[in-house]
Structures are given as structure tokens and as C-alpha cells.
């Protein structure tokens, strides 16, 4: 339950009492740390901690960012910058090499369990497939994301436009 008087998560915006957040990775981390403990967090004393932090940053800065530019120019401003849209799509696809390689011998990205890193990185794959950038589904990424997207919690989360709690 919210520690503030109300919690609201709506259209990628979190309000929890006096706390207001707009960045998705920060929101996920905040919720786990404020309302945990949670196995979704990799702690500093775990071997994969640095990798975990890197994947959290990688999810938005390296993977989701080029998709947002692609979304803008391929779907919202068609014809304005078609070359830029295709360039950002290619950039995104090239950045998947690291993820595909990481998943060669792993079920999850960090600490041999489902963590926030999986949630945050898989959003980029979900967005890519929503935009029909199906080239993102390299074999290991496809296996991993299928498992994540079949989780009951994922199905519940994607079945609603937003969640509001008072």
C-alpha cells in the first residue's frame, strides 16, 4: 500500500504521496525499494550487481530511446524524416547483439532469477514487437521474451491502460 495518501500510476507517470516520477526504470526501482523487500532487486553484495545496474540503464538509454524516435517518425510524422526513422530502427537492432549474446546461456539477465533488469529490458522488446519491428526477435531474445510475456503479471499489466489506487 502507498505510504502517501494516494498512489497513482497513469500514462507512465507515478504519484505516491509527495513523490512524483516520470522515468520508468526509476519508478520500478522506487516501488521495489519502498515497498519491498523484493527478489526483483539485485543487491550490491551479489555478483551480478554491476551487470544489473548496467541493464537497467541500457534498457532506456540504449534500447527504448531509438524506438521512441522510430515511433515518432515512422508512425506519428510519416514522411517528415523517413531516413531518420529507418536509421534509428537499424541502430536499435544493432544494439540487440549484447542482449542476444547475454541470453545464450541464461534464463534471465542477472542473478539466475527474474529481476527488474528483465522487466525493464523486455519493455523495449515489447515496444519493438508492438511497432512490428519483429527483427528484434533473435532466437535467444524470442525465447526469453516469450517466457516473460507469458507471465500472469505481464498479462495483467498489459490488459489495463493504467492502474489507479487510492
Label each region the model flagged.
Residues 1-9:
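Single conserved hydrophobic/aromatic residue that forms the stacking wall/gate
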Residues 13-17:
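A short, hydrophobic beta-strand/beta-hairpin element that forms part of a small beta-sheet core
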Residues 24-36:
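A basic- and aromatic-enriched beta-loop-alpha substructure that forms the phosphate/nucleotide-
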Residues 36-45:
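Helix-loop segments that flank and shape redox-cofactor active sites
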Residues 45-55:
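Alpha-helical scaffolds flanking conserved acidic
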Residues 55-152:
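GST-like fold's C-terminal all-alpha helical module
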Residues 154-166:
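Terminal-tail/helix-coil boundary detector
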